[in-house]
Amino acid sequence: MAGKSSLFKVILLGDGGVGKSSLMNRYVTNKFDTQLFHTIGVEFLNKDLEVDGHFVTMQIWDTAGQERFRSLRTPFYRGSDCCLLTFSVDDSQSFQNLSNWKKEFIYYADVKEPESFPFVILGNKIDISERQVSTEEAQAWCRDNGDYPYFETSAKDATNVAAAFEEAVRRVLATEDRSDHLIQTDTVSLHRKPKPSSSCC
């Protein structure tokens, strides 16, 4: 892409095992790996795209969902432009924990205006037939907690994955002053963002 692009930092949060790494890899590489291990700490991948005429470099951060990795993941919340809160539709506990993930992010990211911060909610693993969280339950949570957009996704068959990430970009574009994010696309520098201290597939 020629000219100027916007660099957006998007972070995936949610319980371990809900498919955050698979969603990131499906979107960036269009691949699904059944052998992915739980993330240790954080890792990120970049994706260049055009949304509604805007050229964007999306820096997608995947975080470890296990409680014991909290000290590793929370320093990387700062500077995020959007947060994708993720649960698995076949795991009701991961859905119930969304509020805790939201609170953790707002606190450690030092979000100044939580009411207007762009969150997108993902209900992953809809390819699994036996689900514990209904579409209506998830939609009601989104309405009650900030009228957030909700996508039911499957990293396995790519259902709604691209649509969810593109909506995240739209939400950022609608709320952010893009002048703070402009970069030259032919010399993309990520030095202003922290690098992961530890990562795993």
From Swiss-Prot:
It is a lipid-anchor. Its main location: membrane. One of its GO terms (molecular function) is GTP binding. Its EC number is 3.6.5.2. The modification N-acetylalanine is found at residue 2. Mg(2+) binds at residues 21, 39, 62. It holds the Pfam family Ras. The modification Phosphothreonine is found at residue 187. A lipid is attached at residues 200-201 (S-geranylgeranyl cysteine). SMART domains: RAB, RAN, RAS, RHO. GTP binds at residues 17-22, 34, 38-39, 65, 124-125, 127, 156. Regulated by guanine nucleotide exchange factors (GEFs) which promote the exchange of bound GDP for free GTP. Regulated by GTPase activating proteins (GAPs) which increase the GTP hydrolysis activity. Inhibited by GDP dissociation inhibitors (GDIs). A motif (Switch 2) lies at residues 64-78. A motif (Switch 1) lies at residues 31-42. It catalyses: GTP + H2O = GDP + phosphate + H(+). It is found in: Cell membrane; Endoplasmic reticulum membrane; Golgi apparatus membrane; Late endosome. It is an enzyme of class 3 (hydrolase). Belongs to the small GTPase superfamily. Rab family. The small GTPases Rab are key regulators of intracellular membrane trafficking, from the formation of transport vesicles to their fusion with membranes. Rabs cycle between an inactive GDP-bound form and an active GTP-bound form that is able to recruit to membranes different sets of downstream effectors directly responsible for vesicle formation, movement, tethering and fusion. RAB9A is involved in the transport of proteins between the endosomes and the trans-Golgi network (TGN). Interacts (preferentially in its GTP-bound form) with GCC2 (via its GRIP domain). Interacts (GTP-bound form) with SGSM1; the GDP-bound form has much lower affinity for SGSM1. Interacts with SGSM2. The GTP-bound form but not the GDP-bound form interacts with HPS4 and the BLOC-3 complex (heterodimer of HPS1 and HPS4) but does not interact with HPS1 alone. Interacts (GTP-bound form) with NDE1; two RAB9A-GTP molecules lie on the opposite sides of the NDE1 homodimer; the interaction leads to RAB9A-dynein motor tethering. Interacts (GTP-bound form) with NDEL1. This is Ras-related protein Rab-9A. It comes from Canis lupus familiaris. The lineage of its organism: Eukaryota, Metazoa, Chordata, Craniata, Vertebrata.
